[in-house]
Every structure is written in C-alpha cells, then in structure tokens.
A protein has these predicted regions:
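Core-facing hydrophobic residues within beta-strands of well-ordered domains
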Residues: 3-6, 88
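Core segments of cupin and vicinal oxygen chelate
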Residues: 12-65
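Vicinal oxygen chelate
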Residues: 14-17, 38, 73-100
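Short secondary-structure boundary/capping segments
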Residues: 1, 49-50, 80-83
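Long, contiguous binding/interaction regions
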Residues: 68-71
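Short aromatic/hydrophobic contact patches that present stacked aromatics
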Residues: 8-10, 49, 90-92
Length: 100
C-alpha cells in the first residue's frame, strides 16, 4: 500500500465560531466542507473541515446545537485528559516564512 500522509485529524471544539475565526482568519486555512450530523448519542453535531495543504485537512466537531449532550466544561485539549503535561501530545503544521 502506498503511504499518502493523513487525510484529516478530527478534534472537538466548544466554540465553532472562534475555531473558524482562528483557522480561516489567522492561519488562512479555507473551509472546504461542512456537515451537520444527527448522531443518536450526541445529538446534532456540526463537523467542519479546513484545508491544511497537500490534500490534508483538520476537522472539528461541535455539539453546540445539542445543549446537554456534551458537558459544558468539555476539555478539548489533547494532553490534560490523558494526565500529561502541556504540549506532550500535539500536532504541528509545516510552513515557509520569508526570512529577512
């Protein structure tokens, strides 16, 4: 099987508006897909995909439209829920910056 990198990473967010503002406005990743899913255990889930380049995406799921389905204090960090220090589990985007 030919390795082709990842298709997408999927994370949770409790504020889709702020997530979109950061990934679209700050990082410049265009939104390429938005789904609204009806999931019995989670209710209505908004699922948004951003293009990171090279055919790879990062996606976020939010159940803001289903109050009470996800805890209001949902911890969306990668490390804390595993009992690890900050930054232990993470992902990084490659980039090119012009050097002066």
């Amino acid at each position: 099987m030919k390795r082709m990198g990842f298709n997408h990473i999927d994370l949770a967010t409790t504020d889709m508006g702020a997530t979109r503002a950061f990934y679209e406005g700050v990082l410049g990743f265009p939104c390429v897909r938005t789904d609204v899913l009806e999931i019995e255990a989670a209710g209505t889930v908004e699922h948004v995909f951003f293009d990171c380049g090279d055919g790879q995406m990062i996606a976020f799921a939010s159940a803001e439209g289903s109050p009470g389905r996800w805890p209001a204090n949902l911890d969306t960090s990668l490390s804390k829920g595993l009992g690890l220090g900050r930054g232990v589990y993470h992902f990084a985007f490659g980039h090119e910056f012009a050097r002066s």
